[in-house]
Amino acid sequence: MKIFIEKINDVVKNAFEELGYERETGRVNVSNRPDLCQYQCNGALANAKKHKKAPMIIAQEVVEKLNDNKMFSKLEAVAPGFINMNINDEFLIDYVNEMKKDENYGVSKATEVKKIVVDYGGANVAKPLHIGRSEERRVGKE
């Protein structure tokens, strides 16, 4: 099962690719301005110079391409070329229900088995206890 942001990324990256732009520039990030939108993409800015188009035109093309997608409740191109996105509540509910059906609740299995060693170091009772003794365990010195 794909994580939520990967699903959004796939849809937006496909739109960029279908319009003839670099697929990887369609990467979506969580918005640092939640008052404006939930997610944002600045791929139009990255493609503007290479394709010799204004970033706003590219952003508007991508928004038009994505307008029919039921994943988004709100899509808008804003100056200088950002694409602001809000996710449809029904899509989010469907995603959570899909997670509930999965026995691992959407958490993917580890691809590589790793061994983790946890050392619970204790104070040496033969020496006086002070802050310097705790650094050996905290930093990982032997």
Where are these regions (language model features)?
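Conserved alpha/beta enzyme-core scaffolds, especially Rossmann-like or related mixed alpha/beta domains
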Residues: 21-30, 76-79, 115-121
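N-terminal catalytic cores of NTP/NDP-binding nucleotidyl/phosphoryl-transfer enzymes
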Residues: 42-45, 49-50, 94-142
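Charged, compositionally biased N-terminal leader segments and the immediate start
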Residues: 1-28
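Residue-level signal for inorganic ion chemistry
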Residues: 38, 58, 85, 130
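Short, small/acidic-rich helices and loops at N termini and domain boundaries
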Residues: 35, 39-57
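Carboxylate-rich, divalent-cation-coordinating active-site regions
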Residues: 63, 67-118
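Short, charge-patterned binding micro-sites
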Residues: 27-42, 78, 82-83
